[in-house]
Amino acid sequence: MTMIKLDQIYGYIWINGDLIPYQFARIHVLTHSLHYSGSVFEGERAYNGKVFKLKEHTERLIQSAESLGLKVPYSVDEIIKAHELLIIQNNIKDAYIRPLIWCGDESLNITNPDLSTNFLIASISSMPRSCEQSVHLHVSRWRKAMPNSTPVQSKSAAQYNMAITSKKEAKALGYDDALLLDYEGFIAECTTTNIFFVKDKTLYTPIADRFLNGITRKTIIEIAKSLCLEVKEERLKLAQIEHFTGCFVTGTAIEVQNISSIDLGNKKILFEDNKIADLLKREYWRIVRG
């Protein structure tokens, strides 16, 4: 598949209150956040011209910024209106939406009161559904940091360094993605998604206090309970997963995606029962399109 360069996309990006054509959207090479990972962002999806859970995404974006000491110059309502303006201007139906908040180029000191806070919202036409393909996981050698060492509920660029490294290593070994463990060796998440396991009519998922509690994750839990499925949030060990019959991951970009296998190194665990995952997937699609 031919990749389209993002700067060749037709349309506009909303930057600090203005609509800027894609090809003219630029930042300086000495931008503070480019050097120190001091940015926060959201991953959102628009369906039929409406962003799903936009208020929740916006509130989390502001909380992420505040956790890094960034003062957001816009309210939740103003950010929502900016989304609506961009959707109209770009004639958006289905798209991936990326809001980003970052520090400017006034200084390269670690902290400086004169650093500006900048805000953009970009849209990218949705790619073909990857969620229709099952994936194979490799257990990463890298561990998630202790939750008191970084704001784990902040969706910040810095949080993705380990995820990027882990996924690169997994892909180099022939896998699709990596399963990440926390600092104690319990199952945490995948590189950009939350993970669920299935046995009978019960979902098992790690407690979301050591990694980002995804908005799609919370939505799937709500859907499962509405369908009279039991949901257990627990500390899960790798040794437990061979007792589960199904496995899937959730995230805004991939929605709900089946997991075919997890390679533990000494054995490969296969998951062949997708009935519950497919049920949740159908219900999720119905809701986001509603």
Swiss-Prot record:
PROSITE patterns found in the cross-reference section: AA_TRANSFER_CLASS_4 (PS00770)
GO biological process: isoleucine biosynthetic process; L-leucine biosynthetic process; L-valine biosynthetic process
GO CC entries: cytosol
Gene: ilvE
Keyword presence, Nuclease: no
GO molecular function: L-isoleucine-2-oxoglutarate transaminase activity; L-leucine-2-oxoglutarate transaminase activity; L-valine-2-oxoglutarate transaminase activity
Protein name: Probable branched-chain-amino-acid aminotransferase
Known role: Acts on leucine, isoleucine and valine.
Organism of origin: Rickettsia prowazekii (strain Madrid E)
Family: Belongs to the class-IV pyridoxal-phosphate-dependent aminotransferase family.
Functional pathway: Amino-acid biosynthesis; L-isoleucine biosynthesis; L-isoleucine from 2-oxobutanoate: step 4/4; Amino-acid biosynthesis; L-leucine biosynthesis; L-leucine from 3-methyl-2-oxobutanoate: step 4/4; Amino-acid biosynthesis; L-valine biosynthesis; L-valine from pyruvate: step 4/4
Enzyme class, UniProt record, top EC level: transferase
Keyword Amino-acid biosynthesis: yes
Needed co-factor(s): pyridoxal 5'-phosphate
Gene3D superfamilies named in the record: 3.30.470.10, D-amino Acid Aminotransferase, subunit A, domain 2
NCBIfam families noted in UniProt: PRK06606.1
Domain of life of the native organism: Bacteria
N6-(pyridoxal phosphate)lysine: residues carrying this PTM: K155
Catalyses which reaction(s): L-leucine + 2-oxoglutarate = 4-methyl-2-oxopentanoate + L-glutamate; L-isoleucine + 2-oxoglutarate = (S)-3-methyl-2-oxopentanoate + L-glutamate; L-valine + 2-oxoglutarate = 3-methyl-2-oxobutanoate + L-glutamate
Its EC number(s): 2.6.1.42
